Amino acid sequence: MKILAYCVRPDEIDSFKNFSEKYGHTVDLIPDSFGPSVAHLAKGYDGISILGNDTCNREALEKIKDCGIKYLATRTAGVNNIDFDAAKEFGINVANVPAYSPNSVSEFTVGLALSLTRKIPFALKRVELNNFALGGLIGVELRNLTLGVIGTGRIGLKVIEGFSGFGMKKMIGYDIFENEKAKEYIEYKSLDEVYKEADIITLHAPLTDDNYHMIGKESIAKMKDGVFIINAARGALIDSEALIEGLKSGKIAGAALDSYEYEQGVFHNNKMNEIMKDDTLARLKSFPNVVITPHLGFYTDEAVSNMVEITLMNLQEFELKGTCKNQRVCK
């Protein structure tokens, strides 16, 4: 298959070279993010590959349909940037990478929890200013806390297994589909019970219409005073304005955000010499008890390699069978 890969980072190039040969593809790589303005570049190709922050709206999809594209493979698990109704209408087969490396995100999540509970980022900032005092840096021990995991699929299970080594006081979880393996470590509770009982709430659920802004004013009010919130999943699971109010009131002791609901166009881009136009993000950055990372929980050597390989496997399967096990929508 002849493939055009958009938004290719330097760290992906070797993987594309190696796996395109393995799976018999001809792949051209460009750094441009996919969107309506560059969709015309797909003319002459059979399929394209994109990333999670690319603009895959109706306009862009119609343009690649006019170019003859029938296959679109995103190198991510998340697909919230893709207009599935338009893809189906235009007969474009879409596939994603549902499990590239659950360990990458789970390990990062544990790191975020330690960063919050031991105030590591705040301590590092103070040391940069030659402030070596201990005042304000007292932390809490994980073994005295209850962990609440929302979403116990592949990543959530690995998160649970990771925290189990710290001897947490208790581990509870919520998922509409209970994981039998997770039951070896956690007790499943209702969502309200998780909000009420957990000292640390960590999110590992996909974004759906039903759970959009699940962490909002009402749910935060149900939480313990001094709760820690971690989001290494989808940004729009959290209502950012409600989060800010919770931080200002002291209800929330700290938040770690590896995803943010308005991250598109900001995360994974260098904005050092630009004025911050997003007032909400600027306010979140101003809190000493908020850790923000640019959606890099997935970002390990193994995960990057797997994301590229599985993407090319998906496209090969489309070519050979007309369908794909990781298919999300087709005509």
Swiss-Prot record:
PROSITE patterns reported for this sequence: D_2_HYDROXYACID_DH_1, D_2_HYDROXYACID_DH_2, D_2_HYDROXYACID_DH_3
Q: Where is the active site?
A: 234, 263, 295 (proton donor)
A single GO molecular function term of this UniProt record:
phenyllactate dehydrogenase (NAD+) activity
Q: Which GO terms describe its biological process?
A: L-phenylalanine catabolic process; L-tryptophan catabolic process; tyrosine catabolic process
Q: Which transformation does this protein catalyse, written as a reaction?
A: (R)-3-phenyllactate + NAD(+) = 3-phenylpyruvate + NADH + H(+); (2R)-2-hydroxy-3-(4-hydroxyphenyl)propanoate + NAD(+) = 3-(4-hydroxyphenyl)pyruvate + NADH + H(+); 3-(indol-3-yl)lactate + NAD(+) = indole-3-pyruvate + NADH + H(+)
Q: What are the protein's UniProt keywords?
A: NAD, Oxidoreductase, Phenylalanine catabolism, Tryptophan catabolism, Tyrosine catabolism
What family is reported?
A: Belongs to the D-isomer specific 2-hydroxyacid dehydrogenase family.
Q: What biological function has been recorded for the protein in this entry?
A: Essential for the reductive metabolism of L-phenylalanine, L-tyrosine and L-tryptophan. Catalyzes the conversion of phenylpyruvic acid to phenyllactic acid, 4-hydroxy-phenylpyruvic acid to 4-hydroxy-phenyllactic acid, and indolepyruvic acid to indolelactic acid.
**What's the protein name?**
Aromatic 2-oxoacid reductase
Organism annotation: Clostridium sporogenes (strain ATCC 7955 / DSM 767 / NBRC 16411 / NCIMB 8053 / NCTC 8594 / PA 3679)
